[in-house]
Amino acid sequence: LYQQGGTVYDEELTKSVLDSDPALKAFKQFTDFYTKYKVSKKLNHLTYFRTGETHIVFMPYTFYANLQAAAPEIKGQWSFAQVPGTVKEDGSVDATVSGTSTGCVIFSNSAHKQAAWEFLKWWTDTEAQVDFGTEIESIQGPSGRYPTANLEALRMLPWSNAELQAILSQCQHTQAMPEAPGGYMTSRYIVSS
């Protein structure tokens, strides 16, 4: 959708604009995967990729840990890259994808706001994120690779140079979908269409 120049909501976030030309073009492209190219609607990405029944999957980079744990027999036979993009009229490639995030909150009625703030500053700091990621991976191996949102910490975790560059490049081409009341239903309706 974003690669087609579209968006999900109007600027005020009061209504969907999924009936716009870019949205309809993106939806057609999306449904073509299933109707024209016969992509399975019930694809078990891990199993089908592991067995070679599908040769490419579009998954979050956290899928890396799943493959490390569940498919050691194909270790070294796969890699990941930035999502392919749409060639624009000027020849540039738009590889924008939508992204989601989670956040940390401190409730306004908390009796320990300052302590909570100090904890969040510590927890999201590079050193804590690297220490946590390293500790988890030392226990679980590569299947425990921690998906930190701290980009400085991400650079310090044991990604290969090619893997790290792919992740960082995709980060530069990720656009958060705005939050709107009831917005959690939007993706459900799109997927079930």
Residue ranges and their predicted role:
Residues Y64-I74, P84-S192:
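C-terminal lobe and pocket-closing loops
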Residues N44-V57, S192:
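Short helices/loops that flank or line small-molecule/ion binding pockets
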Residues S20-F27, P60, S160, G183, ...:
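A structural signal for well-ordered alpha-helical scaffolds and beta->alpha junctions
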Residues Y2-G5, K28-T31, V191:
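Amphipathic, well-packed alpha-helical segments that form the structural scaffold of globular domains
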Residues E11-K42, V83:
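Glycine-centered hinge/linker elements that transmit conformational signals in sensory
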Residues L1-V8, Y34-Y37, Y61, A71, ...:
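A generic secondary-structure signal for well-formed alpha-helical elements
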Residues H55-P60, S79-A81:
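Paired acidic/hydrophobic, glycine-rich loop segments that form the ligand-binding mouth/hinge
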Residues L1-K15, T54-I56:
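Extracytoplasmic/periplasmic solute-binding protein
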